[in-house]
Amino acid sequence: MNIVQQLESEWMSGKTIPAFGPGDTVVVQVKVKEGNRERLQAFEGVVIAKRNRGYNSAFTVRKVSHGEGVERVFQTYSPQVEEIQVKRRGDVRRAKLYYLRDRAGKAARIKEKI
């Protein structure tokens, strides 16, 4: 194992990430710095994509806010991501749910995994 892999495994071991995948509804607590104070901001939505690359892993969360679709890409092991909570498990048959971008209302619903 080279030095880069060793450092990445050390950084990854310091954070516990719950098991989640595409279709799951998650709440991501993100650190936001405003001036000299820092607070946590919650971003709740459906995971539409997940990229598993060790320390460089990322996932995309989509939500509809005031009738406008909002997507945000989070680096899984970023120090800005404080916590990830899984609200509900979605039953989907795709790894990437980009088709949800074109759907609205009831058509964008995802069945819950039993």
From Swiss-Prot:
Pfam families: Ribosomal_L19
Cross-referenced InterPro entries: Ribosomal_bL19, Ribosomal_bL19_CS, Ribosomal_bL19_sf, Translation_prot_SH3-like_sf
One GO cellular component, as annotated: cytosolic large ribosomal subunit
Alphabetical list of SUPFAM superfamilies matching this protein: Translation proteins SH3-like domain (SSF50104)
Protein's GO biological process: translation
Domain of life where this protein originates: Bacteria
Role of this protein: This protein is located at the 30S-50S ribosomal subunit interface and may play a role in the structure and function of the aminoacyl-tRNA binding site.
Protein name, entry field: Large ribosomal subunit protein bL19
Organism this protein belongs to: Methylococcus capsulatus (strain ATCC 33009 / NCIMB 11132 / Bath)
